[in-house]
C-alpha cells in the first residue's frame, strides 16, 4: 500500500512538472533606455557579474526555459531589476542613485552579491578581490561626486 502511494505521488509530481512545461515562461528584456555611463573596467565587471539580474540585457541560459527553474529565474531577475537596474541608471534621480550606490557598497562589503547559487551556475561571475576593489573605488568616487553636487 505504501509503495503504491509513493509511486502515485511520484507520478503526480512528474505529471505536474510536465504540465508546467506547457505554460510559456514570461521572460522580458526591455530595451536599455538610460544605461549606466562608467569607466570600461567597471562596466566589464558589472556586465559579467551583475548584468543578468541587474540590467535589461539578461542572458537566459537554456535551463531558464524549464519550469520550475524558469519561474525562479524570472522572479530573481525581476527582483534584481527592481533593486537596481543598470539599464535605467541615468533615469534615476540623484537620491535614488546615491541609495543604490550605498546598497552596492554594502553588498560588496558583505560579499552577498552575486549570490552563491548564481555563481554556481555562472562560474565566471565571481568577484575577485581586485574586482571588488575596482567597484568600491568607483562607488566611492560616485558618492563623493554626488555629495559635491557634480
Predicted segments with their positions:
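N-terminal secretory signal peptides that target proteins for export/translocation
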Residues: 1-2
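Sequence context surrounding c-type heme c attachment/ligation sites in exported
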Residues: 6-84, 94-149
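Residue-level detector of conserved, well-ordered beta-strand and adjacent loop positions
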Residues: 87
